[in-house]
């Protein structure tokens, strides 16, 4: 471990030699600048961060690789940033030496919580916009987050080297939103490095230095924590007051637990141990703790002796918005799945889970996620990093059900839908912001109205781009709304959503019955108006997927005891007369009667085994017709 750490960034690179002043901690706060980059997916922030690493000389040319800060395979493969990363960079303006902390943030809507944590650790933000695409809904959401926290915003247009770039038009768009002049918008190219030097100079000039009391009790804010197999939990902190040194005892203020500080260091961009951290500095702490829940993101770290009494403000626990069941294909993998989820939780504070059993799928977990991408990525990581094969049930949101007698139930799983007289049901709502070219307004409005959306307002950002604001039930945007939106707008629309309370709705639970028995994995909660369509879709899909039996199998969709849709799987008929060559008709009749009796008995006692593939296919959103033939 240490060998690799010392070798990374050891000798000077081909460019400028690696400067030593940034490696010394306890820098004067006036010479520190903390900033993050806000951008939509694919607008080039990881590439811009790469250029900054090269320009400041902290990464040698031979060790450079694209998306240097995206450490997970899945991040590099999908080209998205999931975990917030941070790096300490040296920079000179004239003869003055500065230390810049760059905190790289995710851009996807599900990871807004990661962004809000990164923003807490900064004083400034670079608003990065693709000069060929313009501002997107997600960028706007993160920009408003940064404005709420009073960060200094530096607007920047990236990818100006592209032939399709139209910097003048988009500079006007940015100026319109941020209230600056179009001439103030910087123009850079992360790929070729044009304008990156000027951008770093602007960061030093515009972003305010961190403010804190160097002699007060130590207070540092945790903005991320990751799990390292060799060293336990590595906690990333930003020091606000006082100083933190190794070999001290520290206390986590939310849990009150005390730990020994084994190592304190900086990331530049590989971890380097240091003599401590002072006001405004960003670095990591290692306490030897094995459970990441002990170093909660957003918690305040202070000294155990003479520590602070007031924690830093600005943290909430992330609330899961989407629930889905995860089950191992092989039941014996259940303990492995439990350990895997425990380990993932070390890196992912927003993941919630509890054990559950399903008649159809066996033992598994009900997991809570921030959104669909978060769910997909968690599942991907479980399959990849732990070699598990999983089935996930269709995702659903959290409903509040009020019964006739006034009792309340919170439903995270259709199986727990209460029986009996229901007075009212409340479902979570979201505020959606959609940004798209203005020619697609009609198609977007039609889609949103079909999904029970209400138009809240509409703004033209420029003559050709429009921002639509809708209030919609979260259950409606969960499954394939984003795909439908993209296909109706030729891929140009971008979507962002935030929770906005709850609303009463006419919702029902649709059960799928096989031979009169409900299969819990297929139950779903839908709006009454869409129940017929859902029932019809599921029954016809299952008819294709369940193998034929020796007896007829009815597949029914029901609301309570009312059947709303039915399909039959025809029986396979064994030819019992094959052994009769000619012969008497009564002999044949006897065999046929016997078969009929057998079928009748089978029908009453026979059980239909639903194959795993049928579960997987039925729970995926695509229809059977779309599936490629094997």
UniProtKB/Swiss-Prot annotation:
The lineage of its organism: Bacteria, Bacillati, Actinomycetota, Actinomycetes, Mycobacteriales. HAMAP family: LepA. The gene is lepA. Keywords: Cell membrane, GTP-binding, Hydrolase, Membrane, Nucleotide-binding, Protein biosynthesis. This is Elongation factor 4. It is an enzyme of class 3 (hydrolase). Residues 1-22 are annotated as: Disordered. Belongs to the TRAFAC class translation factor GTPase superfamily. Classic translation factor GTPase family. LepA subfamily. Required for accurate and efficient protein synthesis under certain stress conditions. May act as a fidelity factor of the translation reaction, by catalyzing a one-codon backward translocation of tRNAs on improperly translocated ribosomes. Back-translocation proceeds from a post-translocation (POST) complex to a pre-translocation (PRE) complex, thus giving elongation factor G a second chance to translocate the tRNAs correctly. Binds to ribosomes in a GTP-dependent manner.
């Amino acid at each position: 471990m240490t060998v690799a750490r010392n070798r990374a960034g050891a000798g000077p690179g081909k460019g400028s030699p690696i400067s030593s002043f940034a490696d010394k901690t306890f820098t004067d706060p006036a010479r520190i600048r903390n900033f993050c980059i806000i951008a939509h997916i694919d607008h080039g922030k990881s590439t811009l961060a790469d250029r900054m690493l090269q320009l400041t000389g902290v990464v040698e040319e031979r060790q450079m690789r694209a998306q240097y800060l995206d450490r997970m395979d899945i991040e590099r493969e999908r080209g998205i940033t999931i975990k917030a990363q941070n790096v300490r960079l040296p920079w000179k303006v004239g003869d003055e030496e500065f230390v810049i902390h760059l905190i790289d943030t995710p851009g996807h809507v599900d990871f807004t919580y990661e962004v809000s944590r990164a923003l807490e650790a900064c004083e400034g933000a670079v608003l990065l916009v693709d000069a060929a695409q313009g501002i997107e809904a997600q960028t706007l959401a993160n920009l408003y987050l940064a404005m709420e926290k009073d960060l200094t915003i530096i607007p920047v247009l990236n990818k100006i080297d592209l032939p399709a770039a139209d910097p003048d038009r988009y500079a006007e768009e940015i100026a319109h939103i941020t209230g600056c002049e179009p001439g103030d918008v910087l123009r850079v190219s992360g790929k070729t490095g044009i304008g990156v030097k000027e951008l770093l100079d602007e960061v030093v000039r515009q972003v305010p230095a961190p403010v804190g009391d160097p002699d007060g009790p130590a207070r540092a804010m945790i903005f991320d924590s990751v799990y390292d197999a060799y060293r336990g939990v590595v906690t990333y902190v930003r020091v606000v007051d006082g100083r933190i040194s190794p070999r001290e005892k520290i206390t986590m203020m939310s849990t009150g637990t005390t730990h020994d500080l084994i190592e304190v260091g900086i990331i530049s961009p590989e971890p380097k141990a240091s003599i401590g951290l002072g006001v405004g500095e960003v670095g990591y702490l290692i306490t030897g703790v094995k459970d990441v829940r002990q170093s909660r993101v957003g918690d305040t770290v202070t000294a155990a002796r003479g520590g602070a009494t007031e924690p830093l403000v600005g943290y909430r626990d992330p609330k899961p918005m989407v629930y889905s069941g995860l089950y191992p294909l092989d039941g014996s993998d259940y303990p492995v799945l439990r350990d895997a989820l425990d380990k993932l939780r070390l890196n992912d504070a927003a993941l919630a889970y509890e054990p559950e059993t399903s008649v159809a799928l066996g033992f598994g977990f009900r997991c809570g996620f921030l959104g669909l991408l978060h769910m997909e990525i968690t599942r991907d990581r479980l399959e990849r990093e732990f070699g598990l094969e999983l089935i996930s049930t269709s995702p659903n949101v959290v409903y509040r059900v009020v019964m006739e007698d006034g009792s309340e139930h919170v439903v995270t799983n259709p199986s727990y839908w209460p029986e009996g007289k229901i007075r009212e049901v409340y479902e979570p709502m979201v505020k959606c912001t959609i940004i798209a070219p203005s020619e697609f307004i009609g198609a977007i409005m039609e889609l949103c109205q079909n999904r029970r959306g209400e138009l809240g307002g509409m703004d033209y950002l420029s003559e050709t781009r429009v921002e639509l604001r809708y209030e919609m039930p979260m259950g409606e945007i969960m499954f394939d709304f984003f795909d439908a939106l993209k296909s109706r707008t030729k891929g140009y629309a971008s979507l962002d959503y935030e929770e906005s309370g709850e609303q009463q709705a006419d919702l029902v639970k649709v059960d799928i019955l096989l031979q009169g028995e409900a299969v819990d994995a297929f139950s779903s909660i839908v709006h009454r108006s869409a129940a017929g369509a859902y029932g019809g879709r599921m029954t016809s899909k299952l008819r294709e997927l369940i193998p034929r039996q020796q007896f007829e199998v009815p597949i029914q969709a029901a609301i309570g005891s009312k059947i709303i849709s039915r399909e039959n799987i025809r029986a396979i008929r064994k030819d019992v007369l094959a052994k009769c060559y000619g012969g008497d008709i009564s002999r044949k009749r006897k065999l046929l009667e016997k078969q009929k009796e057998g079928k009748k008995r089978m029908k009453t006692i026979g059980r239909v085994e639903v194959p795993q593939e049928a579960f997987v296919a039925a729970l995926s959103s695509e229809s059977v017709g779309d599936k490629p033939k094997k």
